[in-house]
A protein has these predicted regions:
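Extracellular glycan-interaction surfaces
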Residues: 1-10, 31-41, 51, 55-121, ...
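Low-complexity, glycine/proline/serine-rich flexible segments
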Residues: 1-26, 129, 164
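Hydrophobic alpha-helical membrane-association signature
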Residues: 5, 49, 131-134, 143, ...
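Generic recognition of flexible, low-complexity loop/linker segments
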Residues: 17-19, 82-83, 95, 135
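Extracellular, beta-strand-rich glycan-interacting domains
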Residues: 28-38, 94, 98, 110, ...
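An anion-binding catalytic pocket shared by soluble metabolic enzymes
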Residues: 46
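Extracellular glycan-interaction patches encoded by glycine-rich segments
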Residues: 74-76, 125-145, 149
Length: 172
């Protein structure tokens, strides 16, 4: 399988064309196939997002305590966390987050629902310093093989279909 390796520093990330995101959204989805090397308790590792300006899609793995992991999503000034994940460092996984226009954020890990948050204000895209793979207000430390951003909230069935389509490529 092909993938990019990131060192957890500000020197390794992948840029995107920010203008491609400046469209009308009927929801948002970020889906990433990744392998995390390490994260300290209390730290965030950014899978996709921005490091300056408005957060439109910032998606992270957060470790509230040693060996415990959650997906964190931050957009439009609001944010939330998934339930705890069965994540093992140095093993591939697929994380996904959807947000609908009503403010419902749903979290998925390896195709399975792992929590929701309500009341997260939905915003259309706001210009910022750019959208990046492995860079937000912190950095990814590990590998990323797939990063997909959608202009709508995928359904649970669509998340499962996408997960099923890529899982064997990364030995999940």
């Amino acid at each position: 399988a092909s993938y990019f390796t990131f060192s957890g520093t500000g020197f390794q990330y992948a840029s995107t064309t920010a203008s491609k995101f400046n469209v009308t959204y009927t929801g948002k989805t970020v889906m990433v196939a990744a392998r995390m090397t390490a994260v300290l308790a209390g730290a965030y590792r950014c899978l996709f997002g921005t490091n300056t300006g408005t957060r439109n899609f910032n998606t992270y793995i957060y470790s509230p305590s040693t060996g415990v992991y959650q997906i964190h999503y931050s957009a439009g000034g609001g944010g939330g966390l998934s339930n705890n994940l069965p994540l093992t460092t140095n093993q591939w996984f697929v994380a996904a987050v959807t947000q609908n226009v009503s403010g419902l954020v749903s979290y998925y890990f390896n195709g399975q629902a792992v929590g929701t948050n309500t009341g997260q204000t939905f915003i259309q895209y706001a210009a910022n310093g750019g959208e990046f793979v492995a860079l937000g207000d912190n950095y990814w430390y590990g590998d990323i093989g797939v990063c997909a951003v959608y202009g709508r909230a995928l359904t649970a069935d669509e998340i499962t279909q996408n997960y099923t389509a890529i899982r064997n490529r990364y030995g999940i």
